[in-house]
Amino acid sequence: EYYEFIEDVFSKIYYIMPDDGRLALNIPYEVNYKKSGGGRTFLASKIWNILEKIGYQYSTTIDLNETSPHKSKLTAWGSWLSPSAPYVYNPKECVIVCYKKVWKRITKGTSYFNESNKKEFIKYVAGVWDYRAETQKLTEANYSLDIPLPAIKMFSWKEDIVLDPFFGSGTTGLACEMLGRRWIGIELSENYQNIAVKRIKDYVKIQRSKKEFF
């Protein structure tokens, strides 16, 4: 059911994307699929297979390095000091980057990068992005601004529209506001909608007051 939902959502996104549109999807490498017994699945691979089936073209995978990781499950319960069934836990996530038909942008626009911030560009193209875990528990799955900010800088013009079909607490929208991008956020939960709207409005209000002050 989950995979059918993912295919339905990203099929609709594929339909409305321009031929040179990009998709950047933050996802765990692996997740549990059994409540017990150590069963895990390579989620990133399964999601990519769905995207490829839809028609997306693969570009790259960015490894996300959490600089302040939460405590991981390091014990191998049920096989302590034994190779019978050790539980190896990989908490890492990635960003799968793909495009519709054309990787090099046909449409022209204004880049975030220039000579003054070229070191930032070089850091991002290395393929490993550092991020700090989000400590504010706004929703069940809110994430750090350190993830959408570099993705938007790297893969969009300032004139582009950024779409987030799982808007949640509005982190992508907030990142777009910080970078001067237009954005669209889709969220079914009214509670999450309210959280996102308040969060972004508060940021915009602060920025406006700063401009008025100076």
Listing of model-derived features with the role each one plays in the protein:
Residues K201-F214:
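S-adenosyl-L-methionine
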